Amino acid sequence: MPAQEGPPPYCFSTPLRRGVLRSRYRRFFAEVELENGQPVTAHCPNTGPMTGVCQVGAPVYLSYHPDPKRKLAYTWEMIQVEGVWVGINTGLPNRLVEWGLARGWFPQLAEFSRWQREVTCGRSKIDFLLMGDSGLAYLEVKNTTWAVGSRALFPDTVTTRGQKHLEDLIEIRRQGQRALLLYWINRADCTEFAPGEERDPRYAHLFRQALQAGVEVLPYRIAVSPQGIRPLGLAKIVA
């Protein structure tokens, strides 16, 4: 990845392997033809609908982990959609939020120097408890890849878990504590963010309630490429 101003990008520990998506099946599996023509089965870490980001014939990149303890040596990391790389590994965003917190990726969170992962709050586990001289804040992270034009949307299917998280964040605010919701927009071509009302009307309703309650929403645009991953700043919220 070319040198960029600002905080450092995240780079994959080993080179990714390019291929073409041939099929995705049973949610967890993807058939990919590598550049050398070799067919491989890769783990698909995104078990959701993957609306708009699962086109057969599209270029993809896989990570390779030759660990005999693994059932599959390949993991599907990203797909190219209309010229834009989209990250589909749902295991990465939370890890990269923590990685980015330590490296100044998020100016809105710069006041927090310590954090704890997976803290119980209400009926849910919240991804992060942030700690700093100014006090505490709860941070939940949501990954989204669904886009309509330049607008990212979440969710792309009904998510009762996501609804509970919103209710818990609203309750945190009612108790006078800070609550933040970071949407990891796993593609660089979106400049706006909105709740996916078409797919989950209740989530959209709770999202607007959360805004009114003072939950701080941070829809972060993320640039994804085979060379690395970096933040691009906030998208505009369209509620």
From Swiss-Prot:
Gene3D superfamilies given in the database record: 2.40.50.580, 3.40.1350.60
Membrane-spanning residues: none
GO molecular function ontology, one term from the record: DNA binding
Alphabetized InterPro entries for the sequence: SfsA (IPR005224), SfsA_C (IPR040452), SfsA_N (IPR041465)
Family: Belongs to the SfsA family.
PANTHER family: SUGAR FERMENTATION STIMULATION PROTEIN A
Name of the protein this chain belongs to: Sugar fermentation stimulation protein homolog
The organism of origin for this protein: Synechococcus sp. (strain JA-3-3Ab) (Cyanobacteria bacterium Yellowstone A-Prime)
